[in-house]
């Protein structure tokens, strides 16, 4: 959030931040350096080799980037809303190790708060 600045002090190299939150290769436009990027128009989800013609999380803001962890642990960062959302707990759907329907449902509810 805030391109790596906290209280006016740069705590994360801004060049690294820019690279981490920018598409890192042409195979999967929705992937940076260990961060998943929304708003790219296509994505290849974890564990599949298929490119889907949709945003990574369609109901989330286009500028969102996120970290996905084991058992559905998530960190969503949305610079336009100055928001960080962390999801911890048991997997929302045990059939998928990372991305589940939970993500879109969560963003439908969060978006309703901003309307």
Where are the model-predicted features located?
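...with weaker cross-activation on analogous glycine-rich loops/strands in unrelated enzymes
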Residues: 13-22, 29
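Tryptophan-centered motif/residue detector
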Residues: 6, 35-36, 107
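Structured C-terminal helix/loop/strand segments within mature extracytoplasmic catalytic/sensor domains
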Residues: 67-115
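Histidine- and/or cysteine-centered catalytic micro-motif in compact active-site loops
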Residues: 2, 38-40, 89
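Short acidic-hydrophobic sequence patches enriched in Asp/Glu that either
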Residues: 12, 27, 102
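Structured segments of extracytoplasmic/periplasmic soluble domains
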Residues: 2-4, 23, 109, 113
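Bacterial peptidoglycan biogenesis and beta-lactam-recognition machinery
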Residues: 1-12
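Active-site Gly/Thr loop motif
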Residues: 23-84
């Amino acid at each position: 959030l805030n391109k790596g600045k906290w209280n006016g002090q740069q705590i994360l190299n801004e060049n690294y931040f820019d690279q981490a939150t920018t598409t890192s290769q042409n195979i999967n436009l929705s992937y940076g350096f260990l961060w998943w990027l929304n708003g790219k128009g296509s994505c290849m989800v974890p564990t599949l080799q298929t490119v889907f013609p949709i945003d990574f999380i369609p109901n989330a803001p286009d500028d969102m980037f996120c970290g996905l962890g084991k058992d559905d642990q998530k960190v969503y960062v949305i610079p336009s809303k100055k928001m960080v959302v962390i999801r911890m707990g048991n997997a929302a759907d045990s059939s998928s190790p990372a991305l589940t329907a939970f993500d879109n449902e969560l963003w439908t509810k969060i978006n309703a708060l901003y309307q």
